[in-house]
Amino acid sequence: MTHLLQDKIIVRQFDVQPYEPVSLAMHNFTDRRDDKTPDEIWLVQHPRVFTQGQAGKAEHVLMPGDIPVIQSDRGGQVTYHGPGQQVMYVLIDLKRRKLGVRQLVTAIENTVIGTLAHFHIDAHARPDAPGVYVGERKICSLGLRIRKGCSFHGLALNIAMDLSPFLRINPCGYAGMEMTQISDLVPGVTLDDTAPVLVNTFLLLVGYSAPEFIPWNLDVQGEPLPG
């Protein structure tokens, strides 16, 4: 059973979902899972929202205006989510996969770097600032939480979105940090083009061989419902 669980991962594909119900669902899933629960990946977009991580400081939220600011228990500082950005949450039993937190962060960063390489974009990670960058511009944000030896939260990759709300914050606590996205570098690339590459690159890097893809939605209490 353990060997089969190590191979298996469920990939849930959501439509656009408000941040808070998805966050609640991640907490519920992590609290309820046991050593027989398969790992999961959740693919989702969020309506416009700023999320403030555990290390977040109020002074990095400059002019939120009409965009809500929600406190999150992920690592890191403030970032922005909106339509056209692919969020990928990774709910993984790290002990079962024999992964350390730093190894998972590196795998996520390399997943994004590999995905961007598929579209002929040269990207890199930085030791001083988590995430993925193209030149000096940030294209992907990263924030995790570990509970019971299991990860949740994940990455947010800018694909084809309105980047202007990032000007209302200091992204990830860095004043003047410029953002970029795939469609500005390779016009015409969409979320539908990117998501399969992102998922398959992650599965290959982390070593899952038996993915199961399921379209799902959430109810208002943050409980998954079949899509």
Swiss-Prot record:
Its EC number is 2.3.1.181. It catalyses: octanoyl-[ACP] + L-lysyl-[protein] = N(6)-octanoyl-L-lysyl-[protein] + holo-[ACP] + H(+). Substrate binds at residues 74-81, 141-143, 154-156. Its main location: cytoplasm. One of its GO terms (biological process) is protein modification process. It holds the Pfam family LplA-B_cat. InterPro entries: aa-tRNA-synth_II/BPL/LPL (IPR045864), BPL_LPL_catalytic (IPR004143), Octanoyltransferase (IPR000544), Octanoyltransferase_CS (IPR020605). Residues 35-210 form the BPL/LPL catalytic domain. It comes from the Bacteria. The active site is at residue 172. It is found in: Cytoplasm. GO terms for molecular function: lipoyl(octanoyl) transferase activity. The record marks 138 as: Lowers pKa of active site Cys. Keywords: Acyltransferase, Cytoplasm, Transferase. Pathway: Protein modification; protein lipoylation via endogenous pathway; protein N(6)-(lipoyl)lysine from octanoyl-[acyl-carrier-protein]: step 1/2. PANTHER family: LIPOYLTRANSFERASE 2, MITOCHONDRIAL-RELATED (PTHR10993:SF7), OCTANOYLTRANSFERASE (PTHR10993). In the reaction, the free carboxyl group of octanoic acid is attached via an amide linkage to the epsilon-amino group of a specific lysine residue of lipoyl domains of lipoate-dependent enzymes. HAMAP family: LipB. Belongs to the LipB family. This is Octanoyltransferase. It comes from Pectobacterium carotovorum subsp. carotovorum (strain PC1).
